[in-house]
Amino acid sequence: PYPPPEGTRQARKNRRRRWRARQRQIHSLGERILTTCLGRPTEPVPFLLPPIERLRIDCSEDRGDSDPQGVGDSQIPGKSCDLLGSGTKE
């Protein structure tokens, strides 16, 4: 948690400086773990979006009665699109 705002101005400044240094250390440790143990790059892989013409919000897609051509389908073939989940806690 962020340090509490109490004490003298100098004490608060030092606490914030130490807190930021700790956060940097945690972040770099996380990057090292991702890189060495999981083989993941530290930078996120760019997410490719479909052309803007194919994007749409259509509630009928959930019921399965959308157009048969699949126009507007932004799913990646072979991948399920469960962004919001079922709404129940596990």
Curated annotation (Swiss-Prot):
Positions occupied by motif Nuclear export signal and binding to XPO1: 47-58
Record's keyword terms, sorted: AIDS, Host cytoplasm, Host nucleus, Host-virus interaction, Methylation, mRNA transport, Phosphoprotein, RNA-binding, Transport
Motif stretch (Nuclear localization signal and RNA-binding (RRE)): 8-24
Transmembrane regions listed in the UniProt entry: none
Protein name: Protein Rev
Quaternary structure note: Homomultimer; when bound to the RRE. Multimeric assembly is essential for activity and may involve XPO1. Binds to human KPNB1, XPO1, TNPO1, RANBP5 and IPO7.
CC terms in the record's Gene Ontology section: host cell cytoplasm; host cell nucleolus
Principal subcellular localization: host cell
Gene Ontology terms, MF aspect: DNA-binding transcription factor activity; RNA binding
Protein's UniProt keywords contain Cell inner membrane: no
Top-level taxonomic group: Viruses
Domain remark from Swiss-Prot or TrEMBL: The RNA-binding motif binds to the RRE, a 240 bp stem-and-loop structure present in incompletely spliced viral pre-mRNAs. This region also contains the NLS which mediates nuclear localization via KPNB1 binding and, when the N-terminal sequence is present, nucleolar targeting. These overlapping functions prevent Rev bound to RRE from undesirable return to the nucleus. When Rev binds the RRE, the NLS becomes masked while the NES remains accessible. The leucine-rich NES mediates binding to human XPO1.
Alphabetical GO biological process terms: mRNA transport
Sequence ranges of Basic residues compositional bias: 10-23
Record-linked InterPro entries: REV_protein
Miscellaneous remark of the record: HIV-1 lineages are divided in three main groups, M (for Major), O (for Outlier), and N (for New, or Non-M, Non-O). The vast majority of strains found worldwide belong to the group M. Group O seems to be endemic to and largely confined to Cameroon and neighboring countries in West Central Africa, where these viruses represent a small minority of HIV-1 strains. The group N is represented by a limited number of isolates from Cameroonian persons. The group M is further subdivided in 9 clades or subtypes (A to D, F to H, J and K).
Disordered: annotated segments: 1-23, 59-90
PTM section of the record: Phosphorylated by protein kinase CK2. Presence of, and maybe binding to the N-terminus of the regulatory beta subunit of CK2 is necessary for CK2-mediated Rev's phosphorylation.
Subcellular localization(s) per the UniProt record: Host nucleus, Host nucleolus; Host cytoplasm
Function: Escorts unspliced or incompletely spliced viral pre-mRNAs (late transcripts) out of the nucleus of infected cells. These pre-mRNAs carry a recognition sequence called Rev responsive element (RRE) located in the env gene, that is not present in fully spliced viral mRNAs (early transcripts). This function is essential since most viral proteins are translated from unspliced or partially spliced pre-mRNAs which cannot exit the nucleus by the pathway used by fully processed cellular mRNAs. Rev itself is translated from a fully spliced mRNA that readily exits the nucleus.
